């Protein structure tokens, strides 16, 4: 009987120790964050279809760039636990969410800041990546090419998408929420 009681006590303690920190990660009151757009943190059906289209029409090592990085955003603070494009496309992404990276977790230990709320450490890469979607130019396209990007996943819910993308990339697939482009 004592063994059962101790086991139950340990289990309850472990559950509580896990739940309390997790609550601070997701509580918008604890972080002051709000959802960037109304809706779930995951993809819409059409976004998921677009990611699967990339999976079905590309090679496993093809690199994807996307403008979607934050599950939740307020001002310059980004909850960077966004990873479903890489997950559903089964392709590497130049910059998507970075919360689950070794670098973010190491930086979290040294700074005491939640890894989900740390800014992306390679500001030049992020700026180049995002410029491809907001203000594409020959220089930006060349930079993406040097990184090895083959595909663009333009998520309409993540922000404005420049109509000039079609000058540099070939439109391959479009849904209500996402458009897929390929390097020409």
Positions of predicted regions on the chain:
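Extracytoplasmic
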Residues: 2-184
């Amino acid at each position: 009987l004592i063994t059962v009681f101790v086991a139950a006590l340990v289990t309850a303690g472990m559950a509580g120790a896990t739940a309390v920190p997790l609550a601070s990660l997701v509580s918008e009151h604890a972080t002051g964050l709000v959802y960037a757009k109304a809706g779930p943190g995951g993809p819409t059906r059409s976004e998921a279809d677009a990611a699967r289209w990339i999976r079905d029409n590309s090679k496993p090592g093809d690199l994807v760039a996307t403008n979607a990085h934050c599950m939740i955003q307020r001002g310059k603070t980004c909850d960077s636990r966004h990873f479903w494009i890489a997950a559903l496309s089964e392709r590497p992404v130049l910059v998507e969410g970075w919360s689950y990276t070794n670098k973010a977790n190491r930086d979290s230990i040294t700074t005491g800041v939640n890894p989900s709320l740390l800014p992306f450490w390679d500001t030049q890469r992020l700026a180049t990546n995002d410029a491809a979607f907001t203000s594409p130019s020959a220089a930006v396209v060349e930079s993406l090419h040097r990184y090895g990007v083959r595909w663009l996943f333009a998520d309409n819910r993540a922000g404005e998408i420049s109509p000039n993308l079609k000058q540099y990339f070939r439109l391959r697939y479009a849904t209500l929420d996402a458009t897929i482009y390929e390097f020409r």
